[in-house]
């Protein structure tokens, strides 16, 4: 008698819900940035900002001033090729403002700038190079955090105020000795123009930052046939001590962006501040992964045993009536690199059915067959997939260190510190 081929679809979770369209109201992933994380982020951010401003420099600026001490009615000047050589803001702080954004405050900043200059007046015209030292820089502003239509975080600088208290310029060139003797009176108009132009320049830089953020992928390919959506569901939630990001955290089959047939449920992260970052991974996130693997056929196994076929023929209720509360498993969790690694192990397998049938030789044989299939077929297949890991959400060029995992009701909690690595090339917002 030819064996009958029976396709058994097995996943990490039993998902027998009807397929329906759904709209996600709650996050699959919650990320909390604490004050400790903000403090470190500011330290790392200043390194990044220094690299950016050194690379991009400052836009040219020009103007016209009268030099009464030389009895010159006007001098037109143009400063170009402005490059920042050193950059120091030793006293800078980030403070969350509930429901609004993050307050940035800095004082005692200083910088060394090199530039080319050109001056024109009714009496003379000249050009050369100059070094400009700026000190006693005070800055304050409110960074408003929001969400773009594509689910990216956005930042907008509001209430910008900047004051440069001291400037010293040193000219170079053929007549540098002459110009340097008149440098002090020229520093006042330089300060005046800088204090007028710096806030617009900084605001433009925020536009550049938003453009870079919007280019990062919030839907990333996971394997060959699965997508993972880390987009923001809503603007960041800001309290006096932390910033919460609610991320979608949903898996999809490539080419099919239909939401899973189940909804995430709300969960609350514990009130802690010892770590820089807390990541809550909901049960929905894991169910979404299992469901998507299920749809892609990742856990498909074909059975051809005569004994299995015979048993199903004699029991028209089929496998569905037996396949509930039958397996006892352990789940191992670890964080390697930027990924959550899971592994499954089978402790015990027992068919659930009428107790009078438990002593049946055929039932025991069927139970042993399925136990072997799970132990040697399904679980190794699932673990091979799970060993690829789930990428955890983390900021650009930031690694997770000193990480710990706890199991809570309805979610996993990852507590971690951060380490900035400017050489690490990362292409995704989420992982």
Annotated model-derived regions:
Residues 116, 122-125, 150-153, 206-207, ...:
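Short, solvent-exposed secondary-structure capping/transition elements
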Residues 2-112, 165-431:
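Extended, low-charge, aliphatic-rich alpha-helical segments
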Residues 87-95, 103, 111-118, 130-170:
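Well-ordered mid-protein domain cores that form the structural environment of catalytic cofactors
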Residues 120, 125, 143, 150-151, ...:
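Hydrophobic alpha-helical segments, principally membrane-spanning helices and signal/leader peptides
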């Amino acid at each position: 008698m030819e064996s009958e081929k029976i396709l058994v679809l097995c996943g990490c979770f039993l998902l027998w819900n009807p397929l329906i369209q759904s709209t996600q109201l709650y996050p699959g992933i919650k990320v909390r940035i604490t004050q400790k994380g903000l403090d470190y982020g500011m330290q790392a951010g200043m390194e990044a900002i220094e690299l950016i401003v050194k690379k991009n420099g400052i836009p040219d600026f020009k103007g016209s001033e009268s030099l009464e001490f030389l009895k010159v009615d006007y001098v037109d000047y143009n400063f170009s090729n402005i490059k920042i050589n050193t950059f120091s803001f030793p006293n800078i702080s980030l403070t969350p403002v509930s429901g609004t954004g993050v307050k940035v405050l800095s004082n005692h900043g200083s910088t060394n700038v090199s530039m080319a200059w050109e001056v024109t007046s009714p009496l003379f015209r000249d050009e050369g190079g100059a070094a400009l030292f700026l000190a006693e820089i005070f800055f304050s502003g409110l960074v408003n955090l929001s969400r773009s239509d594509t689910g990216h975080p956005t930042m907008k600088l509001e209430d910008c105020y900047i004051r440069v208290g001291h400037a010293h310029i040193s000219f170079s060139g053929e007549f540098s000795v002459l110009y340097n003797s008149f440098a002090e009176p020229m520093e006042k108009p330089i300060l005046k123009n800088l204090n007028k132009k710096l806030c617009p320049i900084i605001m433009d830089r925020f536009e550049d930052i938003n453009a870079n953020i919007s280019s990062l992928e919030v839907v990333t390919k996971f394997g060959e046939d699965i997508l993972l959506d880390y987009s923001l569901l809503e603007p960041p939630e800001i309290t006096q001590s932390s910033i919460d990001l609610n991320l979608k955290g949903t898996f999809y089959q490539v080419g099919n962006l239909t939401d899973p047939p189940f909804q995430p449920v709300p969960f609350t992260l514990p009130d802690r501040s010892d770590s820089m970052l807390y990541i809550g991974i909901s049960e929905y996130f894991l169910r979404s992964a299992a469901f998507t693997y299920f749809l892609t056929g990742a856990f498909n196994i074909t059975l051809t045993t005569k004994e299995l076929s015979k048993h199903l023929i004699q029991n028209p209720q089929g496998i569905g009536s037996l396949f509930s509360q039958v397996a006892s498993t352990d789940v191992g969790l670890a964080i390697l690199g930027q990924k959550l690694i899971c592994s499954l192990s089978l402790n015990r397998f027992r068919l659930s059915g009428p107790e009078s049938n438990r002593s049946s030789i055929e039932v025991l044989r069927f139970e042993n067959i399925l136990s072997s299939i799970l132990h040697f077929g399904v679980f190794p297949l699932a673990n091979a997939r799970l060993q690829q890991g789930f990428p955890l959400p983390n900021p650009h060029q930031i690694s997770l260190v000193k990480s710990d995992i706890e199991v809570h009701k309805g979610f996993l909690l990852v507590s971690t510190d951060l380490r900035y690595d400017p050489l690490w090339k990362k292409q995704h917002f989420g992982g």
